[in-house]
Amino acid sequence: MSLIDPRAIIDPAARLADDVQVGPWSIIGPDVEIGEGTVIASHVVIKGPTRIGRHNRIYQFSSVGEDTPDLKYKGEPTRLVIGDHNVIREGVTIHRGTVQDRSETTIGDHNLIMAYAHIGHDSVIANHCILVNNTALAGHVHVGDWAILSGYTLVHQFCHIGAHSFSGMGTAIGKDVPAFVTVFGNPAEARSMNFEGMRRRGFSAEAVHALRNAYKIVYRKGLTVEAALSELAESAAAFPEVAIFRDSIQASTRGITR
C-alpha cells in the first residue's frame, strides 16, 4: 500500500525515501529531499531547495522552506536543511536563507518546534532545542544546543541564544543570551542560570557550583565584561562548562543580556 495519500501533490522532481509518509492535501515541490522514516501530515507545504533528514515528523498546516520575506531577497537559490529526529508541530513556518548570509537556514537534530513557532531566514537551530508555542525568531538568529525558548518568546535578528539557556514566557530578547543563563521579561533581563536544565542533564555538582560562581562574577560583582572575562580564566581552564559560558560572552556581537 502506498504511504503517500493520493490527494497529496508531489512534484516529480522531489526525492522521497521509500518509506516516507505524506498525508492528504500536502504539497511537496521540486528540489525537496526527504529522508527515510519521515512523516508528513496533511496540509503541509514544503518548498525547495529543502533537505529534510531521517525520522522527522511534520504536523499539519506547517509551511517549510518558503521564500524569505526579506526585502533584499530577489529570488536567489537558497536552502533549508533539517537534520534527523525533529518534531515540527502544527502551523510552524520556516523560511530558507538569503545570499546576504550563508544562503541557508539550518535545523539540527532532536529538536521540538511547537505549534505556530516561526524560524526566520538564515537562522541556525542546533540540537535538542525546544521552541515552545508561538516563539518567533527573526532572521540570522543562532540557538545553541539544549536551549529552551518558552511560549511567545521573541528574538531580534542576529541574536545568539547560548547552549542550555532558558527564556521565560513572553520574553523579548534583543541582545545575546550567554550559555546556561535564564532570561525573562520585556526587554529580557538575566535572572539566574538554568540549574534545572543542568540537573536534568546530569551536570556534576562541582560543575554547577563553578557555573554559579561564574554567573556571580559576570552579573553580581559590577565588573565590566572585559574584567569579568579575565576573572573567569582560571575557572574556565578547570571546567569546560565555564569555558562554554565564557566563550559565549566573548563571542557576542550584540552585547549580552544583563
UniProtKB/Swiss-Prot annotation:
Any one GO molecular function term: acyl-[acyl-carrier-protein]-UDP-N-acetylglucosamine O-acyltransferase activity
UniProt keyword annotations, A-Z: Acyltransferase, Cytoplasm, Lipid A biosynthesis, Lipid biosynthesis, Lipid metabolism, Repeat, Transferase
Record SUPFAM superfamilies: Trimeric LpxA-like enzymes
InterPro entries reported for this sequence: Acetyltransf_C, Acetyltransf_C_sf, Hexapep, Hexapep_transf_CS, Lipid_A_LpxA, Trimer_LpxA-like_sf
EC number: 2.3.1.129
NCBIfam families assigned: lipid_A_lpxA, PRK05289.1
HAMAP family, A to Z: LpxA
The name this protein goes by in its record: Acyl-[acyl-carrier-protein]--UDP-N-acetylglucosamine O-acyltransferase
Native species: Stutzerimonas stutzeri (strain A1501) (Pseudomonas stutzeri)
Record lineage: Bacteria, Pseudomonadati, Pseudomonadota, Gammaproteobacteria, Pseudomonadales
